[in-house]
Amino acid sequence: MTNQRIGALTFVVRDYDEAIEFFTQKLQFDLLEDTPLDEHKRWVLVAPRGSTGTNLLLAKADSPTQELAIGNQTGGRVFLFLHTDDFWRDCNEMKTRGVKFAEEPRTESYGTVAVFFDLY
């Protein structure tokens, strides 16, 4: 079998700069790339600081169908599972930066869980 990995997952956004601000300022992700592709499209990659795994490709919606997916990209399921080496530090810092949480953190058999809202 070949050696494969997921390089990026697409996150459909309303506006590139608004999404970059959310991910880099609120979540403290790194902006890995922001390359214009044409007059309307950019190749924008973000990832958690220190990550060597999968990146998020921020893709601006360019059709009514894509616009309908903004804010509901996973049909109401959790979109992102973000692992950290210090849950409480990161959770408290995110709250300080204005990230809104759906509920208080809770302990599950697989770890501590906190559900937060993205910009949509």
Walk through the language-model features, giving the residues of each:
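Conserved active-site tyrosine of GNAT-family acetyltransferases
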Residues: 19-24, 94
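Asp-based phosphoryl-transfer active-site loop
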Residues: 120
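Vicinal oxygen chelate
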Residues: 1-8, 30-85, 89-117
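Short acidic-aromatic low-complexity motifs
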Residues: 13-18
